[in-house]
Structure formats: C-alpha cells, structure tokens
From Swiss-Prot:
This is Methionyl-tRNA formyltransferase. It comes from Bordetella bronchiseptica (strain ATCC BAA-588 / NCTC 13252 / RB50) (Alcaligenes bronchisepticus). (6S)-5,6,7,8-tetrahydrofolate binds at S117, L118, L119, P120. It comes from the Bacteria. It catalyses: L-methionyl-tRNA(fMet) + (6R)-10-formyltetrahydrofolate = N-formyl-L-methionyl-tRNA(fMet) + (6S)-5,6,7,8-tetrahydrofolate + H(+). The keyword Zinc-finger does not apply. The lineage of its organism: Bacteria, Pseudomonadati, Pseudomonadota, Betaproteobacteria, Burkholderiales. Keywords: Protein biosynthesis, Transferase. Its EC number is 2.1.2.9. One of its GO terms (cellular component) is cytosol. SUPFAM superfamilies: FMT C-terminal domain-like, Formyltransferase. One of its GO terms (molecular function) is methionyl-tRNA formyltransferase activity. Attaches a formyl group to the free amino group of methionyl-tRNA(fMet). The formyl group appears to play a dual role in the initiator identity of N-formylmethionyl-tRNA by promoting its recognition by IF2 and preventing the misappropriation of this tRNA by the elongation apparatus. InterPro entries: Fmt, Formyl_trans_C, Formyl_trans_C_sf, Formyl_transf_N, Formyl_transf_N_sf, Formyl_transferase-like_C_sf, GART_AS, Met-tRNA-FMT_C. Belongs to the Fmt family.
Length: 312
C-alpha cells in the first residue's frame, strides 16, 4: 500500500519503522520543522525526519497545512507534493499540526491516526500522562479514521495495554509506541483485504487529555498522597514533578515516590522523616515518601544519597 506518513516525535518514529519493516511504500514523510534543542540550542531534526532521511524518504516540513493560514506557500507546496505522490492512505501519529479538510480528503482511503488511548477516553494532547494521573488500570492505542474533530473519528482497531502500578509515563509511552506500530500494520493489512468495519465512537465515556502545563509540576501537598504519587509517575520525565523542601531555595524534582497508607501526623508539606529509606512528607491524606530526587542544576540521586547532602 502506498502511504504518506505524518509524525514528529519518537512515538511516531517507531510507527514509521514498523510500516517500513512491513514493506509498505512510503515515498513521502511530513514532520515538524527542525527545532532548537540541547544546551547550545542547535537546530535539531525530529526523530521522524532522522528515520526518514536514513531510509532515503523525501521529507516535507511545512509550518502549516492551511492554505488560508500564515504560511500559504508552504501549505501549497506540501499539497503539490501529496498530489504528486497520490497516496492510498496517510498515516498520522503525533504530527503536531492540524490537518485541514483538503488533507483529509486527498488520500484514496483517507487519513488514519494512531492515538495513544482507548477512545473515546482521553481524546487530546496528553493521553498517556492523563491515564496514569487518573489512576486508570489500562489504556491502549486506537487506530482511527480521522475527521475534522479532535480525535472524534470512527475507530478501526483497538489494542488494550495494562498500566503497571509503578509505571511512569516514559515507560508507558515506549510500550504504547510499540503497540501502536503493530496496530497500524495490522489495520492496514486488514484494510487492504476489506476486513475492517469502522465503528462510531460511543457518546458515553468521553474525556479530554489536556495539554501538560508546567504549573502542574508543583506538587500540592494538600492533596492525597495517592494522587501525588500518580502525578510523579505521570509527569516523569516531562514536565517533571517538583516539591519544595526546607533549607533549599529552589524546588526539587521528584523522580520516584510512594504513597503510604498511614496518618499524616503533621500539616500538609511537613517533613516527618528523612533518612536512607525515604523522605516522608505529610499530605492531605496519608504520607508521600520521596525515593529519588534531583536538586536544581544537579543530578538524579537515590534518596539515601540525597539526604546525606541535605538536612531539613
């Protein structure tokens, strides 16, 4: 099947690799423009662009696909490239640009999206993090026929993935990326044989995964410890949960924490204990034990190392 692939981060790169390994013809890739990265803020290509160039695939990087937007010339050039390629399907995975109607209509079989949740739960920008934050027992990937709405299109295939009790967003991301790559390969194989029946998303159970905000990173110790522990996992590695500790001017990043089912024994935010076993923080309900931390400008440290250089 002749495909155009549109995606940007590592999640999408894994899907592109899976499509190429399955033997699909991918003559064109769309990805976001190169961005400054690292301490030197050097312009860096996306993981998808790097993979495409390594495979000898043509790459387009329009800043917008809207013909009536801020970059109409770039959108028109991308449209000309797509029309020349004449794809059967466009596969979209974490691309980062809104697809206007002309884009949805151009491929013979439309545009298929790899979404990192079991729709209609967690439509939107941050489904992996929000699933962990909410305490969901499972999530998954959905292959969806794209329409003009926000993750509202008909579902073609779903694959459920359990969420581990201590699993971080980074770990779940990697698992879902692999599941998504296999799911899109399976979906295209079934689609080519006429074996996929689109299913309308149910009206019940719709939730939205709002984009992550840096302000959310600061742990509010008036919340229950269980909620805070989930946020530590959900925000690992980005934006990274933080907490303020006495004696330190800057917030400390929390990489790993555990909720203890015991009485707080102090006002929210109070340090109840600090030793090699952990730093116990009183919360609105229960105790949050900090297990791995990082001072501003420092390195990640297990708590037994951290406490040797800090006293409350």
């Amino acid at each position: 099947m002749r495909l155009v692939f549109a995606g940007t981060p590592e999640f999408a790169r894994i899907a592109l690799d899976a499509l190429l390994a399955a033997g699909h013809d991918v003559p064109l890739v769309l990805t976001q423009p190169d961005r400054p990265a690292g301490r030197g803020l050097k312009l860096t290509p996306s993981p998808v662009k790097q993979a495409a160039l390594a495979a000898g695939i043509e790459v387009a990087q329009p800043r917008s696909l809207r013909l009536d937007g801020r970059y109409p010339d770039e959108a028109a050039a991308a449209r000309a490239q797509l029309e020349r390629v004449a794809p059967d399907v466009m596969v979209v995975a974490a691309y980062g640009l809104i697809l206007p109607q002309w884009t949805l209509d151009l491929p013979r079989l439309g545009c298929l999206n790899i979404h990192a949740s079991l729709l209609p739960r967690w439509r939107g920008a941050a489904p992996i993090q929000r699933a962990i934050e909410a305490g969901d027992a499972e999530t998954g990937v959905t292959i969806m026929q794209m329409d003009a709405g926000l993750d509202t299109g008909d579902m073609l295939l779903e694959r459920a993935v359990p969420i581990g009790a201590q699993q971080t967003a980074a770990q779940l991301h990697d698992e879902l990326a692999l599941a998504g790559g296999q799911a899109i390969v399976d979906a295209l194989a079934a689609l080519g044989q006429g074996g996929l029946a689109p299913r309308r998303q149910p009206d019940a159970g719709v939730t939205y995964a709002a984009k992550l905000d840096k302000a959310e990173a600061a742990l509010d110790c008036s919340l229950p410890a269980a909620v805070l522990a989930r946020r530590v996992r959900a925000f690992n590695p980005v934006p990274g949960a933080t907490i303020r500790l006495p004696g330190l001017d800057d917030p400390v990043k929390v990489w790993r924490a555990q909720a203890l089912e015991q009485a707080a024994g102090g006002p929210p935010g109070a340090v109840l204990r600090a030793d090699a076993q952990g730093i116990d923080i009183a919360t609105g309900q229960g105790v949050l034990r900090l297990l791995e931390l990082q001072k501003a400008g420092g390195k990640r440290q297990p708590v037994d190392v951290f406490v040797r250089g800090w006293q409350p």
